[in-house]
């Protein structure tokens, strides 16, 4: 007896606007360049880390004048934002309001970690961590780098 099998292959096309947006190396380097330009204009020196949404390092730069541990701190800030989805500046308040939060993995309660959202503000694609100056200056550097790359620091609803 012969059996006949019919295989039906269905492909589904995802609309362009719904396709996955990722943080590539070229874009990460543009963020670093924008942050560096901002820092130089302010006569500051930062260590900058750019990670994807999984917290994996995509680009980094330690500007002249920073100590050896500063790069690690920048990466920790970026990875904290990748893990939690909100700026490190807000983690201090979250730690005050939520007992035990400060003991959770990847929590950094110092400003300088900022999320990276796609240009349309609909997809979180990574994070930037900057360290080496006052926390507010670190955050401003990260935000300037993100803006220079044509991306957003927050979601657009």
Indicate residue ranges for each PLM-predicted region.
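N-terminal signal peptide c-region/cleavage motif recognized by signal peptidases
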Residues: 11-15
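Flexible, solvent-exposed loop/hinge segments and secondary-structure transition points
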Residues: 16-157
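Cleavable N-terminal signal peptides
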Residues: 4-6, 16
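Compositionally biased, low-structure terminal segments
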Residues: 6-8, 102
């Amino acid at each position: 007896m012969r059996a006949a099998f019919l295989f039906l292959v269905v492909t589904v096309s995802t609309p362009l606007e719904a396709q996955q947006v990722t943080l590539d190396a070229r874009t990460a380097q543009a963020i670093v360049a924008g942050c560096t330009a901002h820092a130089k204009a302010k006569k500051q020196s930062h260590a900058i880390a750019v990670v994807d949404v999984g917290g994996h390092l995509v680009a980094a730069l330690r500007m002249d004048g920073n100590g050896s541990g500063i790069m690690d701190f920048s990466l920790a800030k970026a990875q904290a934002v990748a893990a939690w989805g909100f700026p490190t500046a807000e983690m201090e308040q979250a730690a005050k309001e939520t007992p035990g939060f400060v003991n959770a993995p990847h929590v950094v309660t110092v400003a300088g970690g900022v999320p990276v959202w796609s240009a349309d503000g609909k997809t979180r694609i990574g994070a930037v961590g900057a360290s080496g100056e006052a926390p507010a200056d670190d955050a401003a550097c990260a935000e300037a780098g993100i803006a220079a790359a044509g991306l957003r620091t927050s979601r657009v609803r």
